[in-house]
Regions:
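Zn2+-dependent cytidine deaminase-like catalytic core
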Residues: 8-11, 17, 45-149
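Short glycine/serine- and small hydrophobic-enriched flexible loop segments
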Residues: 22-25, 40, 93-96
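Short, basic/aromatic recognition patches
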Residues: 5-33
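Short, Lys/Arg-enriched N-terminal segments with co-localized hydrophobic residues
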Residues: 1-2
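Short beta-strand scaffold segments in enzyme catalytic cores
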Residues: 33-48
Length: 149
């Protein structure tokens, strides 16, 4: 985007959501991709994307999704299936709690089965486990969705 007037400048929320869209490109999940950015005092303190725990084989490397193979519905079975760490979790782990206190978490999601929105999840919602982590980390604000542009 080339600015022609001062009011053409991208908002900070759109800026950080756009970065989260780039972060999700690193996701190794075949089902859905998420990107998270944690910002404090206008500084990015951590990013995260969803994928297998460190050292474990990724679905993208395996060529199949374990959750799909076992017919586990979206939003269920997180406690029983240890094949994924969510974007929000990875970002919080990378930042550490002391940096997260009072921060804002930006989250975007993509699901290729959602054809009506070209795959973008308009209102991605953290799961109950991620919400507990967000609360315990001291994150004070969530910005969910897509940039307005």
């Amino acid at each position: 985007m080339i600015m022609t007037q001062s009011n053409d400048r991208m908002s900070k929320n759109d800026y950080y959501l756009s970065i989260a869209m780039q972060v999700l490109e690193r996701s190794t999940c075949l089902r859905r991709q998420y990107g998270a950015v944690i910002v404090k005092a206008d500084e990015i303190i951590a990013t995260g994307y969803n994928g297998s725990p460190r050292g474990m084989e990724n679905c993208s490397d395996r060529g199949f999704c374990y959750r799909n193979l076992k017919n586990i519905p979206s939003g269920q079975g997180y406690e029983d299936v240890h094949c994924s760490v969510h974007a929000e979790q990875n970002a919080i782990i990378s930042a550490g709690r002391s940096k997260c206190i009072g921060a804002t978490l930006y989250l975007v999601g993509y699901d290729s089965s959602k054809q009506e929105s070209h795959g973008w999840i308009k209102e991605p919602a953290p799961c109950s486990i991620c919400m507990r982590m967000i609360i315990n980390a001291g994150i004070s604000k969530l910005i969910l969705g897509l940039p307005e542009e």
